[in-house]
Amino acid sequence: EAFLYGSASDNNIDPHIDSWPLGHEELVSVLTNASLIAGFKSDTPEKFVSDKNEQFQSVLGFHGMEFVLFREGQNRTVDAFKANETEEGMTSVKGIDELAFLAAVAGDVKNMTAMLEFTWMGNAASNDTKQVLQDNSYVFSSMRYNGFAAKGTMCYGQHLLTPAQTTGYQSWPGTINQIFVGGCSNICNEVQEQKLGQAWRVLNNQGGTTEDGEKESRDYIESPYSHRSFVDYKDNLYSIKNTLYGTRDVNATSPAANSIMSLLTSLNYPDLSKLQNALTAALKSLDDATAAQGYFLADPGSVAVKNAIDKIKDLDDELNAAGTWIG
């Protein structure tokens, strides 16, 4: 989630695979549409999703799959899939049709994540990824410049690492600032302001309006069916830690030698300890909230949630300060 700049945004991969909250009315429409169900059961269901997804964009990706797999924080049972759906408005939907939808959407996610890796890494992408895209080459047609940066002349990794006036970011400080602000701060702000903040504000009589002019909603909650919201939000923060530490080890206690934190150390960034402390406190705040109430949906308006909002906002402030200092 801290890497939503570049290919994920330019090629609309993130909204394609991670749209939420789930569009319930659209999901009802999809799962009761005989022609769409037939497409999900076709010989090439993932291609059907790729070609026809304008009819069900709000139910694609991880959260469409979540709806099929989980209810009330529990795995759905085999017996549940042998029967009809029990969700309001869907009681005519057969479990086997839901599984067809699940498999089709999962195949589409597989293709999109392969595309994300390939457009960042180019020929350095794994052989498995290259094979997925070779078998499903139609996905390139939906991408700008076949998915690549600088009008198709290079992969996004190369683009990020070659600052130049004509092809990449204009300077190294600009590149690092993009990582801090366009990457890390972007998801950090979303977690505290929207993923946690919107439901908390509404439940504490502080709800406002969204960018679209709609009233904020207490139901604006990610992963409500699996009850894994806090887990998801902590993973969002781990993506920030991975970015700063130069590692994929979320339990790392020190940054890699060639990492942004090590770079800040070498440059004698005066507020390095404030950044580190804010990261540690933000992660801990979600552990504390989990210990206090179990899962977000249990009490979205709680004191523990407000504490997490505040700590994650502190981290966002430190990320922007570091980005400004280096950029």
Describe each PLM feature range.
Residues 2-327:
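Mature extracytoplasmic or organellar-lumen-exposed domains after removal of signal/transit peptides
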